[in-house]
Structures are given as C-alpha cells and as structure tokens.
Amino acid sequence: MDRFEQNEKTPVTEGICLLTAVSPRRDEGTSPTGIIGRKLARQLLAMGRQVRVMAETDQCGGWPDTVEVVEGSITRPLECARAFDGAEAVFLAGAHASTVQDALALMRDASARRVVLLSSHGPEYEEANPPETWFWLAIEKAVERSGIDWTHIRPSAVMGAAVEGTYPATGSDWPDTVRADGVVREAFLGRGHYPFIHEEDLAAVVAAALTGDDHTRTIIEAVGPPLSTRSRIRSIAAALGRDIGTVDLAPDQGRANWRRLGWPDGAIDVTLYALEEYGTHYAELLQWTLDQRPSVQDIIGRPLRTYDDWVSENIDSFR
C-alpha cells in the first residue's frame, strides 16, 4: 500500500467524529471500546460535535439519542464502508492488525484529517520481537504510515473493564464472585499493584486529541496511579457496607482461574508479570507515572477521578 505524506499539521474542522466499538472479547486486542466510546460520545456532543458510531451488534444500544449508529465492525471495515463517509476525525478502537490497512484506506477515501488510536502498552513489549509477531505495534505503525494526522493513546487499565470483563487485571470476575459469595480470589493479593484510569478521564483525553492539534503525531501515556489490589477491594467493601472475603491465589492458581474464565495465556502472562512488577518496583513505577508529560490532568484540565468515584458510580454491579 502506498505511503501518503503530510508535511504540516492539519487543523480539525467540525465535521463528523466517527467512533468505533466492538464486542467485549478476550484476546490480544481486547479493550473496553463501548464503555469509553459512550463517555466520549457524550463529551463530543457537549462540545457541539456531530457523532457517528460504527458498532458491532451488541454495542449498538446505549448511545445518546443524537448519535448516528451504524451497525458494523471495525475488524471488517470493507463490509461497512459507508460508515466512513464524511468522517473528518476517527476514534479507532478495537481494530485488528490484519484489517487495519483497509480501515485506513477508507479513511483516506473519506478525506479524514485525523485518527486517534486506542492502543495499549503492548508495543513497548512487542518491539523486542520480530515484526511478524506484532499486534498493537503493527496497528500503530500502520496508522503512522497512513498519511493521516494521528495520535496514539496508551492507557492504564480502564476501571470500567471490571464490569465489561475486558481485562483480567481489572478484576474481570469480581462483580460475579462478590455477588455470588462475597469473595475476591486473586493472585498477588498481598502485594499486587496496577495503574488505573477512569473511563470518563480517558474519554476526555481522546476528545482533546480528536478536536485539537496539540497532540498530533504524538503518543499519549494516559496513565493513572498504581493502585493496590487490596485498596480496590476495600473501596468496594466500603461502598457495599459489608466485608469482602479474600483468597490469595498462588500464581499458578491465578493462571488456572483466568484460563477458566477464557483468558488466553498471553494476556495472563502480561497480567501476572505486571502485578508482580508494580508491587516489587512500586516507587519507581509510581515516579514514572508522575513524570509523564503532558499528564492526563494537564490534558483534561481537572483532577483525575478516583477508584472510589468509580465504585460509587458502579456499585450496583457488585450487589
């Protein structure tokens, strides 16, 4: 595919903002696209923007009334090419490495001016491996070579993924086990830490990248502070007004539990590694988070929402 070049930043006009949302899945491309997208849609509408969503079947509901919803999948973009018509800015979420070139070609055909990619921290690990093994990094490279102004967003774990079940480190089975028997079973329970960001804050970062030009051709580390597993359990217990039992699983038991829930070994490997690393090197990783510039707070212009905030908004999922 030809590479297109643009030598100057192209300002975003107020045309259609196209968002993409896929069904929750448990594979290497997992991300809570619907949770983030619905928050983003509301924020863009409040800014006076026109919003269209290309959503897989089970993600077509729950959008604001004024959002145009087109049923289709960003993983099979050629089947829904009309969704790209008139799109000037695209929030690319849930794309697949094998078909992202097709999506980018449709964006060019539509004269899209900007694409904001919901990426992950996967590229930081993938770059040490042969290109044929890349997933996230393959998508990032394709976007960079598309000729469209781009921004990559590499977020912390999204708090809402615990409810949607799209990332094991978020406690993807906690709502079920807390409701069923009031217990959380987790590996590295005593010292596990993981960085989190509220989906409302992440959506605000995306909105800033979609509608302004301050972040063109940059990678935004949309990271929140590392939280301990026990502190998250305490937040849920306090909101419920009752104790939550805990079972500290050995790593191999944690792996077996996540396998039972349908997670592939690759996702489990990353999760176990990260939980242990953040616990062992908490001070260094916290400092790395604090050193990121621009910070999420710099971008959105307000303090970040906390895990307690998220729990208070979603406590019914645990009742």
What function would you assign to each model-found segment?
Residues 92-107, 280:
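N-terminal glycine-rich "phosphate-gripper" loop used for MgATP/nucleotide binding
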